[in-house]
Amino acid sequence: MNALFAALLVTVSAGNDKALHLYELNPKSGALTQRSKINLPGAPGSQFVSPDGNRLYVSVRTANSVAAYHIDHAKKTLVPLGITDIGANAAYVATDRTGRTLLWASYSGGVVGSHAIGRNGAVIKGGLSRIETARCAHAILVDASNTFAYVPHTCPNAVYQFRFDAKTGKLSKNEPFTSHPAEGLQPRHLAFHPKLPIVYFDDERGDSVTAYSLNRTNGQLKAFHTVSTLPKDFDGNKNSCADIEITADGKFIYASNRGHNSIAGFGVDAKTGKLKSLGQTPTGNTPRSFNLGPANKWLIAAGQRSHDLHIYERNPKNGALTKRHHQPTGQGPSWVQFVPVRKLKETAKK
């Protein structure tokens, strides 16, 4: 356990249950204990923890809304702050680097937008920006400078590029508006290298991860390296990639395979950012989402069709994953999220 954290909570979006399942992870064994179940007015999806670690945002997809929660570090629970109608079914939600603006991307609507976040952490109704792109907008994240935002789209096989104004919370189109990888890859989710000017996207139909160079001056992306997530003898027509994560030290990347039902691992070259396959680790049926813990010791993958969680301990030296636990969960888990609980300062005795 990281010295800063008193506990690790894990939240699971169970779409079929229309509920958020809350667990606590044992930092030594990796075992999960369920703490609560939060019912929602629609199917939950994407989740995001604010930069200060005090808020959790959850897309309530079928209600076209976003739910906000205060993370109560003393009681190790979530306190509801409200559910805000954003007028779109958000496949992905995130905040900017300051935590003052909520960003979202709608797969079915082909639109992205931003909303202000109030001082209490709730999302304020009435958007700051709303920009049409194309169908199949899968994710949205801002870069480390909080200046550029990227939205991978599978159907048009493109990454849509935006400028972000942290003062106003508004998105605007960058020029050129799109960056295209090789034909048929279909970028889905993304992860920024913590040191190098590189962004990695997992490719839904390409069964691969593609690295893009990031021009820190104009925000433009350019694909330069692609590596498969599958073993050579597996039929790629029976697979699609879903999620991607990079370790905090930038040394390893993981991507999930739906069909092959595995987590693919890669070593990252410290100078070039190019990837070397480390193989695949079996996991649950249709791993739509997985997440690395804050110290990168634990990785949890959610099997959307097996309705379960698979908990792995990660070797920090070689990136290998060792399965420690299997946990049944709610029906149709589409997202799993670590929620760190901080240690509270002891009150001085008077």
Where are these regions (language model features)?
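Hydrophobic beta-strand positions that form the internal "hydrophobic ladder"
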Residues: 8-10, 56, 102, 149, ...
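Short loop/turn segments immediately following beta-strands, especially the blade-tip
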Residues: 23-30, 69-76, 115-123, 162-170, ...
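Beta-rich, blade/repeat-based domains predominating
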Residues: 41-52, 86-100, 130-148, 180-197, ...
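Short loop/turn segments immediately following the C-termini of beta-strands
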Residues: 13-15, 61, 107-108, 117, ...
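A short beta-strand motif characteristic of beta-propeller blades
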Residues: 33-39, 79-84, 125-131, 174-180, ...
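Blade-loop segments of beta-propeller domains
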Residues: 34-99
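Blade-level signature of beta-propeller repeat domains, shared across WD40, Kelch, NHL, RCC1
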Residues: 304-308, 313, 322-350
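An edge-strand/N-cap motif at the start of beta-rich repeat modules
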Residues: 7-31
